[in-house]
């Protein structure tokens, strides 16, 4: 909390996070129209847009095509890796001058539902006990790469893929937002080999949930060692059901 601030000063400002490379891709004229529609609506409903991975773009310009992300919005560059901009972002959403909920959206809920129905959301957790002890990095890296390969071969576009491994010797997380993209890796990369690994996989992809699940299950069976405690769900988001429509404020 900022010096001199009290609990009564705190407010909540809706914010959206935007991956710069993924955002630039969705803003191209040849991008998938449904995915671009969802992206634009998510930006529009936010009072503050947070552009992530600032550490990859020292000049804060981002990849080509990024500029429209912040058009019409308050925007901040953030880096979860270095902490750049995080304190300023927290101060802004809690104590800043931006009016919370100041935007009224005109949403085509039928199109929104169609766009979300094109996505498969997969959540997977399991325990891996390899035949020989191995480090978390050597579990996460090959598994994420293998998932990328089989999803690409199945012509399933990745929107977001994250693999997290927790072991007694340390943890590692790797994630990316497109097929073939270099993953962002965090954690204890030099952790010692471990005999037991608890893994989480979060996947958002464009495709039929049953097909996405089949592909991921197939790769799960390829892991060497004993796999147990599998919890897997894969589904398309249900259609939004707004409780009420708020009339647009008079100018």
Predicted feature locations:
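Phosphate/Mg2+-binding loops and adjacent switch elements
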Residues: 1-77, 84-89
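Class I S-adenosyl-L-methionine
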Residues: 56-57, 78, 83, 87-98, ...
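P-loop NTP-binding site
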Residues: 95-251
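Structural motif
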Residues: 54, 80, 204-206
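Alpha-helix N-cap/loop-to-helix initiation residues
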Residues: 57-58, 82, 132, 209
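Acidic-enriched, low-complexity/disordered segments with a strong bias for Aspartate over Glutamate
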Residues: 9, 19, 25, 30-34, ...
């Amino acid at each position: 909390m900022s010096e001199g601030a009290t609990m009564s000063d705190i407010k909540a400002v809706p914010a959206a996070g935007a991956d710069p490379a993924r955002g630039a891709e969705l803003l191209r004229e040849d991008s998938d129209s449904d995915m671009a529609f969802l992206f634009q609506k998510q930006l529009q409903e936010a009072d503050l847009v947070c552009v992530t991975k600032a550490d990859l773009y020292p000049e804060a310009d981002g990849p080509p095509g990024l500029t429209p992300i912040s058009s019409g919005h308050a925007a901040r560059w953030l880096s979860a890796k270095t902490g750049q901009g995080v304190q300023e972002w927290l101060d802004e959403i809690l104590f800043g001058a931006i009016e919370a909920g100041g935007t009224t959206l005109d949403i085509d809920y039928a199109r929104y539902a169609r766009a979300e129905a094109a996505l498969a959301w997969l959540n997977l957790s399991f325990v891996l006990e390899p035949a020989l002890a191995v480090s978390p990095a050597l579990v996460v890296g090959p598994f994420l790469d293998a998932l990328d390969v089989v999803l690409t071969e199945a012509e399933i576009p990745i929107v977001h893929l994250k693999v997290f491994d927790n072991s007694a010797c340390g943890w590692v997380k790797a994630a990316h937002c497109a097929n073939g993209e270099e993953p962002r890796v965090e954690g204890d990369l030099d952790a010692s080999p471990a005999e037991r690994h608890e893994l989480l996989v979060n996947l958002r992809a464009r495709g039929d949930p049953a097909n996405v699940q089949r592909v991921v299950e197939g790769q799960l069976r390829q892991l060497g060692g004993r796999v147990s405690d599998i919890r897997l769900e894969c589904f398309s988001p249900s259609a939004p059901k707004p409780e009420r429509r708020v009339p647009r404020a008079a100018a």
